[in-house]
């Protein structure tokens, strides 16, 4: 795919943003190592792998959109700077949505760490103090 895109003058790269949760994909150094171990590397993919929101997930752009829940999503800079996005993905189980596919992969995969935090903010527990016994 990368070679085909290059034949049209494109500069293809594989990308992802760091995760909100701790682990090997929460920083770009270990994220790249994990990607390489899973076969996503310049040799097998014939293009570079770039962690779009930088080393610690703080490299992003706020993109104004007309969204009710997220009016200015924080998008990894490398993704925001891309001329075109070609999404190649698979389905996978997700505990809240049932399945994750193209929309989930683009929505969460393009969001920086801060963007993911904002997207998950609505799932925070809420306390009804009227029903609380103060335990």
What kind of region is each of these model predictions?
Residues 1-135:
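N-terminal and secondary-structure boundary signal
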């Amino acid at each position: 795919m990368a070679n085909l895109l290059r034949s049209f003058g494109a500069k293809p790269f594989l990308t992802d943003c760091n995760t909100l949760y701790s682990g090997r994909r929460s920083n770009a150094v270990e994220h790249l190592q994990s990607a390489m171990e899973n076969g996503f590397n310049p040799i097998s993919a014939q293009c570079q792998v770039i962690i779009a929101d930088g080393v610690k997930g703080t490299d992003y752009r706020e993109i104004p959109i007309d969204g009710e829940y997220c009016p200015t999503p924080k998008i990894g800079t490398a993704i925001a700077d891309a001329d075109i996005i070609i999404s190649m993905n698979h389905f996978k189980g997700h505990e809240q949505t049932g399945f994750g596919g193209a929309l989930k992969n683009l929505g969460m995969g393009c969001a920086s760490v801060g963007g993911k935090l904002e997207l998950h903010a609505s799932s925070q527990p809420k306390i009804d103090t009227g029903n609380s016994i103060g335990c």
